[in-house]
Amino acid sequence: MINLKNVCLAALLSASAVTATAGGLLTNTNQNIAFNRMMSREASIGIDGVYYNPAGVAFMKDGHHLSINLQTAWQTRTIENDYALFNYNVKNPTTPRKFEGKAFAPVIPSFQYAYNKNRWSFQANFDLAGGGGKCKFDNGLGSFEKVVANIGFLGNSLAPYLNGILPVNPNIANPATGTMGGYGYTYDSFMRGRQYYYGLSVGAAYRINDHLSVFGGVRGIYATCNYYGYVKNIAFVGNNGAKLPLSTMVDRNDPESSDIELNTDQTGYGFTPIIGIDYKTGRWNFSAKYEFKTRMRLKNKAVN
């Protein structure tokens, strides 16, 4: 006999995994306040160059140079899903549907440090290379509701057998049979994600002459993430708003037997080399920095 709860949980985990990895890791590039004034920083000769143009920092004056930055960021992300069975959600019978998430990062710290001596420049940079905050979807995700909608479709296919327990709604077209008389569905859902990718880079630049300098360094990244979400109170809705909880079909003695909850931590780290070059002549300055791909292996730990 198939365990319905295990099937639902597997579907939810698959859906959340797709959601978590679809966008990949987005590298943050606003690692200095100067970026907010002008985004073209790749040829700058200043302390922010520790991140944007490390080779060019070698042309700064001898001594210690330090920049400390604190920023705040917020964002609203909207995901649209047009799954046809969403029309059977009695709380919101519409499709396409928009799922809105709000992200807020009160403090995004970073610092750049350089010590220049003669032709050498020794540098360090700390930042949030990726992530930096939390995002909440108060009504869950479309991928979550798709699982519930498919369960609703299963309930409609069983309507001839369930009608004695839960009378069908004569005003609903049954998606399984194409005839009038079916069930809607209802549920509660929530999703929250948190990502922090801490980056620390160290390296040295060497001024070959008054026009040319080169840089070599390494960046280490430590990742810590958490994803929490749930789908609860799944029920079929029949005539006059009557409900049949899914839990009565899974384990009638446990009202939470059909609830699905996900709470997963991810941690990992990686290292990557960085190289750079800067050439200046007169009023012109040309520079390039290449940061190799960072290979990271994230370890998953399911809390529940």
Where are these regions (language model features)?
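Intrinsic low-complexity, intrinsically disordered segments enriched in polar/basic residues
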Residues: N3, T19-A20, Y185
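Bacterial N-terminal signal peptides that target proteins for export
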Residues: M1-C8
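Catalytic cores of large soluble enzymes that bind and process phosphate-bearing ligands
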Residues: K5, G101, R192, Y196
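Outer-membrane beta-barrel porins/channels
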Residues: G23-S40, S44-I45, I108, A114-N304
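N-terminal hydrophobic or amphipathic segments with adjacent small-residue motifs
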Residues: L4, S16-A17, G270
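N-terminal, post-signal peptide beta-strand-biased segments of exported outer-membrane/organellar beta-barrel
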Residues: C8, V18-K136, N150
